[in-house]
């Protein structure tokens, strides 16, 4: 079943399955589906017959107890279980204990009046686990795969059209760039952009540039380009702006290293014939980020990418082991990378 089919089914009033498994890292659709499941319960009954539990902090048994209870003056109960990390291969010890034996028993005979929904925000589950096999057998599964840039464009434009709005191509391009083609971020900006664009119902470039802030990742991507261009003054100025915006120096450096790591991986694998789609799935990176990395890596030598990555690793060590000013450390890194004989 697709996302669209499930949303239509939830709105139709038709009978629902006993168990659903919503997989994938598309936060926008996770939230939209949870709202749709909640709305199958009449508003007057939602306080008693709808519940959502975060399994990172709440034992599974609490959610199952709720699922096994009869609805209170209503026809059905909906119970949502968020972040069931025990379905993955994650080895980090959980904050709470989960009774998987009780879940196995429940799945063999679900409560007829309850709709139990697992929201699993992961790329994949550990298919070797008995509980995963049993859940997939018992549940109706919906997989929220990553949207390509084209999918994001089409979906966002379709949502605007439903509201009787249009958007300039250059405005949409800028919005995608500033949000890293993250549909959740774009949809979070939609209402604000529409309100700004009244009464014309048309979103222009100035609305996007005036209202939508770039993500830290996009700012760091701009910083990467200045580093590789050996634009010391421009790179240091942007780095200073990030610090003034209260971004943590270690976080900036970590994202910088991650960007250079992605450029190196992309360059090496592209030479081996990997397509953009295969790169995204292999590296587990959003297709839009891979697209930008492919465009960037073509302009630079692997030796420069490696040198920048190692230089940033050195900056990280010094940030952690000395009291030197982060901006000074970055400035010295840039001076050295640009070709001058300076020892950091």
Task: Pin down the residues of each PLM region.
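Conserved beta/loop motifs at nucleotide-recognition and modification sites
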Residues: 1-344
